[in-house]
């Protein structure tokens, strides 16, 4: 049979080879679309993976944790508990504050959740206390998310109450209006108010009760509609001096008349302009300040949002008096930008390394140019798809593109190497391009779809990990797909136009030396392959040994969740004695801040004490430590944390808990440490028994450090035990007693002053400047219906007891959280196993439910799905290869290369001291797609040699190994060098990228050494097996 002319070949590439103008313009269109998409893409640290989270805050000044739980938190929880799509509800009820955090399923829209939350709050309104001064408010942000920017506002001349007023009316509202801002909170705010400090002795002398004062003030300060009327010719609106606005006017307010003389408020109380809440304070580097924490809206472009705020700051500063300064303390986007810049540099470095590898192997500038064009074209074209899919430029998508650098060039290398082989044999460039491209087309398709098949399981991963890596997988898949298109269109077209025999035959000293070197390497490989094929069972034993070793290494390697990043910001919690006073806590906070500011790596510190949505009690203070840029410090964040904790340990009466701020936040509450473990039961008393016991046992474990719990039942409680019979005889009711105590000690908000721009409160309290301990309680006097004054001591006894500082719930049941960090030298998996073992040994009661929270819970879920994820990737690739080859056997041969990659990756992780975390797992899955390329290129040529040239399986696979050795080595080196920049990352966020690079380099080195020998042996083994299965069983007569 006469062989057809090559001009009739070309397969899917034929049209593009013969139409160079159309091919060029198509590539230009891809390039332009990618550039436009890149300019429009948002920039972020990680893909948008936030759970829809809403925080509901209710303030009830003066209420104890028990009162907050029963009267505020429980009614709201009951309504929230019936909402669909609710994943978890946690609450914290402390003195004067109830904070409920609602975390919804990832599939639920935040806007839908917001509507449900508002409806639930409305439904609970009638069940809440009637004197609740503030209705429940909600925010569509995760309280555990660190702010994207932190501002400090200080003043050298103005009181903080005036500064607060300006912030609320001028600054906070303007920043809240910036696109992308989700919430602006003021920490340490000193809202102005009129404080009425009652004199118990003066009240008693006039025969007055605190309730009569409260009633008089409430009645005297009103702001209600008064109507209007029409006269004969005009309409008149009514107004009156029904409001009291100044402190002097309040002093002159008449409470009652005694002996025909007025009793004014100043006669029984001190009235002054003062902060609404005197137990809130914040500092910036030890200077009293109001801290503005700015949190982003879910899904917002964090870089654009921060830029808008920065552009707005000069205008805001100009609107303030000169004595008021706005200082930028922290900007999360600084490290995000630096991290993205580092990855972009590593991407460019990877491209340069890959191009260098291509030149070393092809040894021709023109031949190097052709596959080198495929790299930027494939990567830039991917940006267009990323834009239409709603992705962002972040660490993971840039990591995907960096790894793709080694992938996208592979196809072009395979094509150009095959075409160049025919040109070197003397064929015309056009004929060689048509013949070479047509011959290799199926291989390119096999390589592309089998590699994309590996990524398919990543798309179906559930929960937050699936969301996190979806952008990674799709970005990588799109770049691989575009590279295949480029390799089947542009690459052969350029080969036909640019390559010729003279250019390829041109040699210099470098090309001749490198040619001799490659010839020697191929000859050495051929001799080694001959020996290996003559001893197949030894090689097969090695292959089986790698599989066994992979399983063993997976069992023993430490397992983690997500690498701890150094983003230059540390969150801190200062914990003091449960009975500490506010003023003493201020002193402790200053001591800790002083010690931190002395550290040379610290740039600034903001601190806060008081009860708000993130801080549950007065005995804990919050810190945000901003480190100097990487260029100004040589130490990583964990080293700095260890040193700061050692310095704080010298301060008596406090414990300092520190953790680095992370890009990925799964938790729903601000914690002292990175990881949490909760106990949940019906009984608070049972928690009080077992939480301290378990905490004490966990503190003994070497795998853990910074172990603590939020169980605090040592608060000082003054229990007023009323003799009800005696009180009734004297005409005193429990309502009067509660009201008198609330008026005296609750910072009770009794009235509101309305202005054109803001509202201010009138606060009632008892003035007891020189009293200590429980003495102020002995000054309480009550007035019965006949006007008689009844001392509280005559109807009640005061007992000092212990009580809880906060009551925590998870899904409406009492709970307590044990926080911990992983000790150096251990992984999160070690810590989880140690906790589970300790829990089992202690034999907790069956009605106590234990559960890991946040990152640890996600780690457990990821750990159980890891094996299935790898299995799913292998099965998906087997199915694709089986369909492409129409064979059950050949896919098994190709997949036999995988254990070698697993061994190399796991050994590299162990040698480098890294744990097997989610990033490393992704690296192993990518290796599954890469290392099988070697087998595909060998088997494709072997099958073609058997089918078209009638070679024996031995001759076919032997020739395929030698012919494909150089492209196999070239593609592997390209993939390996694309991962080298990630492996040696040192900049911001390097902890996130390094495990991927380590896995890729270790797996590729090991697989490259072994698969060149194991694949042909297994190919021949399965070929013999297939022949035996196909050979018919001989008949009895034939046997004889």
Swiss-Prot record:
| GO MF, one example | xenobiotic transmembrane transporter activity
Q: How is it placed in the membrane, per its record?
A: Multi-pass membrane protein
**Among its keywords, does the record have Cell inner membrane?**
yes
Q: Which residues cross the membrane?
A: 16-36, 342-362, 373-393, 396-416, 440-460, 472-492, 537-557, 865-885, 888-908, 911-931, 968-988, 1002-1022
* Record keyword tRNA processing present: no
Q: Which UniProt keywords apply?
A: Cell inner membrane, Cell membrane, Membrane, Transmembrane, Transmembrane helix, Transport
GO cellular component term, pick one: plasma membrane
Query: Where is this chain's protein located in or outside the cell?
Result: Cell inner membrane
* Pfam families (UniProt xref): ACR_tran
**Which PANTHER family does the entry mention?**
MULTIDRUG RESISTANCE PROTEIN MDTB, PTHR32063
Family in the record: Belongs to the resistance-nodulation-cell division (RND) (TC 2.A.6) family. MdtB subfamily.
Complex and partners: Part of a tripartite efflux system composed of MdtA, MdtB and MdtC. MdtB forms a heteromultimer with MdtC.
What protein name is recorded for this chain? Answer: Multidrug resistance protein MdtB
Q: Which gene encodes it?
A: mdtB
């Amino acid at each position: 049979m006469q062989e057809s002319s090559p001009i009739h070949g070309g397969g899917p590439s034929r049209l593009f080879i013969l139409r160079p103008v159309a091919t060029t313009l198509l590539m230009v269109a891809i390039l332009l679309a990618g550039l436009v998409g890149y300019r429009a893409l948002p920039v972020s640290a990680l893909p948008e993976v936030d759970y829809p989270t809403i925080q509901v805050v209710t303030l009830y000044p003066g209420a104890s944790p028990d009162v907050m739980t029963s009267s505020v938190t429980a009614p709201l929880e009951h309504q929230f508990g019936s909402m669909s799509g609710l994943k978890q509800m946690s609450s914290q009820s402390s003195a004067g504050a109830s904070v409920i955090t609602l975390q919804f399923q990832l599939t639920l829209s935040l806007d839908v959740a917001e509507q449900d939350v508002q409806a639930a709050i409305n439904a609970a309104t009638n069940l809440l206390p009637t004197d609740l001064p503030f209705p429940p408010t909600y925010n569509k942000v995760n309280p555990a998310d660190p702010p994207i920017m932190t501002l400090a506002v200080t003043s050298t001349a103005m009181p903080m109450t005036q500064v607060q007023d300006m912030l609320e009316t001028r600054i906070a509202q303007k920043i809240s209006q910036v696109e992308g801002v989700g919430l602006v909170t003021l920490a340490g705010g000193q809202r102005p108010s009129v404080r009425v400090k009652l004199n118990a002795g003066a009240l008693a002398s006039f025969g007055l009760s605190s309730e009569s004062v409260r009633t008089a003030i409430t009645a005297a300060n009103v702001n209600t509609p008064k109507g209007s009327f029409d006269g004969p010719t005009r309409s008149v609106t009514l107004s009156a001096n029904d409001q009291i606005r100044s402190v002097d006017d309040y002093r002159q307010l008449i409470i009652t008349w005694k002996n025909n003389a007025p009793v004014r408020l100043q006669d029984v109380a001190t009235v002054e302009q003062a902060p609404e809440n005197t137990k809130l304070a914040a500092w910036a580097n030890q200077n009293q300040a109001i801290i503005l924490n700015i949190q982003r809206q879910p899904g917002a472009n964090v870089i654009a949002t921060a830029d808008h705020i920065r552009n707005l700051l000069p205008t805001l500063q100009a609107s303030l008096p000169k004595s008021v300064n706005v200082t930028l303390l922290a900007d999360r986007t600084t490290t995000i930008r630096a991290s993205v810049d580092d990855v972009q540099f590593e991407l460019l470095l990877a491209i340069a390394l890959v191009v260098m590898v291509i030149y070393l192997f092809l040894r021709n500038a023109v031949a190097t140019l052709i596959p080198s064009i495929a790299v930027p074209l494939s990567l830039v074209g991917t940006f267009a798809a990323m834009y239409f899919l709603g992705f962002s430029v972040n660490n993971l998508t840039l990591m995907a593109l960096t790894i793709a650098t080694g992938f996208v060039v592979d196809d072009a290398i395979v094509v150009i190497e095959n075409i160049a082989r025919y040109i070197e044999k003397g064929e015309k460039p056009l004929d060689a391009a048509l013949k070479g491209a047509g011959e290799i087309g199926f291989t390119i398709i096999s390589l592309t779809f089998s590699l994309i098949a590996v990524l398919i399981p990543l798309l179906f991963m559930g929960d937050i990990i699936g969301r996190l890596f979806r952008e990674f997988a799709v970005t990588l898949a799109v770049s691989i797909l575009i590279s295949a298109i480029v390799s089947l269109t542009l690459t052969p077209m350029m080969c036909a136009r640019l390559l010729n025999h003279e250019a390829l035959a041109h040699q210099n000293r470098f090309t001749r030396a490198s040619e001799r070197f490659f010839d020697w390497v191929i000859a050495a490989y051929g001799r080694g392959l001959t020996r290996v094929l003559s001893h197949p069972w030894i090689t097969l034993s090695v292959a089986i040994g790698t599989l066994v070793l992979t399983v063993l290494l997976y069992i023993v390697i430490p397992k983690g969740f997500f690498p701890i990043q150094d983003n230059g910001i540390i969150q801190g919690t200062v914990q003091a004695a449960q009975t500490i006073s506010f003023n003493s806590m201020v002193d402790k906070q200053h001591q800790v801040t002083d010690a931190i500011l002395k550290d040379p790596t610290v740039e600034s510190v903001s601190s806060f004490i008081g009860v708000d949505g993130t801080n549950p009690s007065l005995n804990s203070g919050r810190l945000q430590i901003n480190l100097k840029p990487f260029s100004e410090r040589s130490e990583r964040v964990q080293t700095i944390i260890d040193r700061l904790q050692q310095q704080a340990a010298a301060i008596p009466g406090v414990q300092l808990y520190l953790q680095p701020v992370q890009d990925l936040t799964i938790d729903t509450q601000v914690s002292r440490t990175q990881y949490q473990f909760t106990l949940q039961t019906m009984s608070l008393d049972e928690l009080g028994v077992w939480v301290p016991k378990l905490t004490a046992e966990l503190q003994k474990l070497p795998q853990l450090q910074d172990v603590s719990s939020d169980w605090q039942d040592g608060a000082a409680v003054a229990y007023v035990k009323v003799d009800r019979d005696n009180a009734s005889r004297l005409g005193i009711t429990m309502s009067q007693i509660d009201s008198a105590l609330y008026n005296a000690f609750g910072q009770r908000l009794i009235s509101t002053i309305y202005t054109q721009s803001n509202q201010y409160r009138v606060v009632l309290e008892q003035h007891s400047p020189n009293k200590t301990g429980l003495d102020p309680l002995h000054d309480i006097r009550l007035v019965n219906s006949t006007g008689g004054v009844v001392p509280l001591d005559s109807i009640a006894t005061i007992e000092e007891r212990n009580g809880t500082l906060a009551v925590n719930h998870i899904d409406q049941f009492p709970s307590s959280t044990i926080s911990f960090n992983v000790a150096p030298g251990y992984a999160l998996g070690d810590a989880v196993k140690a906790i589970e073992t300790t829990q089992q040994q202690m034999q907790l009661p069956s009605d106590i439910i234990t559960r890991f929270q946040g990152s640890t819970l996600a780690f457990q879920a990821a750990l159980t799905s890891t094996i299935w994820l790898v299995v799913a990737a292998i099965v998906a690739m087997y199915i694709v290869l089986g369909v492409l080859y129409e064979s059950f056997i050949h896919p098994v041969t190709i997949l036999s290369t995988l254990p070698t990659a697993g061994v190399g990756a796991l050994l590299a992780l162990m040698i480098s001291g890294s744990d097997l975390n989610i990033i490393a797992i992704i690296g192993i899955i990518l290796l599954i797609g890469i290392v099988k390329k070697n087998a595909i290129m060998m088997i494709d040529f072997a099958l073609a040699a058997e089918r078209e040239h009638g070679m024996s399986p031995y001759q076919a696979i032997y020739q395929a190994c030698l012919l494909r050795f150089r492209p196999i080595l070239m593609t592997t080196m390209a993939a390996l060098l694309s991962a080298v920049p990630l492996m040696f990352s040192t900049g911001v966020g390097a902890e996130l990228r390094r495990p991927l690079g380590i896995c890729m380099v270790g797996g590729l080195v090991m697989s490259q050494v072994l698969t060149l020998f194991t694949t042909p042996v297994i190919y021949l083994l399965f070929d013999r097996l297939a022949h035996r299965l196909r050979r018919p069983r001989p008949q009895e007569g034939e046997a004889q």
